[in-house]
Amino acid sequence: MPPFSHVPVLADAVVAGAEHLPHHNGVLIDATLGGGGHSALLLERFPGLRLIGLDQDPTARAAAAERLAAFADRVEILATNFASYTPPAPVLMVLADLGVSSPQLDVAERGFSFRLDGPLDMRMNPGSDGETAAELIDRLEENALADLIYGYGEERLSRRIARRIKADLAAQGPYEGTAALAYAVAGCYPPKARRGRIHPATRTFQALRIAVNDELAVLDRLLQQAPDWLETGGVMGVISFHSLEDRRVKTAFLQDERLERITRKPTVATDDEQNRNPRSRSAKWRLARRVNGC
């Protein structure tokens, strides 16, 4: 398999979402291009669509360019974060898949994985000069770190975990890598709780990743800006993977006068898809339409 092999989640729901468009001759913005899986399906299904794909991860952009080579004359890939982008003209559809892709999780050097040992980094753009996860946990005081782990990870043991992390740093210096941090977090759980389907470090790693990449603030900017990108009748679809994201998307689609909800309740993966692709278990798809006069 190629180094950035990635199975798009809720693919049928995304393609079905494009059926709500008033026509299919215009621009699709994939705000989180990744490996290009969703975009490839949409370009194949709707020959009149043209793609502007945004991603700050150079590995993802290279993989997407390869995957979308058959549609090269209809594709533009930009090295940017969706929060800092504005399209030159109204577009038909905006798509965002908010999850960390499997290839990013499966490459130890990226520092996202608690199962594979790697540097404690977690930056979506590893070439940036932004703060790494290692620098973040070193900088924060114990109470602030606990608040972060609770607020962004919804981790009920956040105080105990923050205390353990700061004690480790004081006693032995920086963690050698992600495995050492994951081991420390797991040690804060009772032995029986360490054997569940969900790894004990999942919520803590989620919290650190969100903080390092300012993910919720970036999502808020997308939800504020993207409706203005759409032509009347155009649609915006978002795939979220945890409740912090989904609540924001749900609230924006419900309260934004520029939008009309198409999905009243989120679409989730079928049992079959969840069995084939465990990553899809927590995925939720919401879709809204741009309305006129706002």
From Swiss-Prot:
Domain of life where this protein originates: Bacteria
Record-level GO cellular component terms: cytoplasm
Record's subcellular location: Cytoplasm
GO molecular function, one term: rRNA (cytosine-N4-)-methyltransferase activity
InterPro entries: RsmH, SAM-dep_MeTrfase_MraW_recog, SAM-dependent_MTases_sf
Positions of the UniProt region annotated as Disordered: 265-285
Family of this protein: Belongs to the methyltransferase superfamily. RsmH family.
Organism: Synechococcus sp. (strain CC9902)
Record-given protein name: Ribosomal RNA small subunit methyltransferase H
Main location: cytoplasm
Listed HAMAP family: 16SrRNA_methyltr_H
GO biological process entries: rRNA base methylation
Species classification: Bacteria, Bacillati, Cyanobacteriota, Cyanophyceae, Synechococcales
EC number, as in UniProt: 2.1.1.199
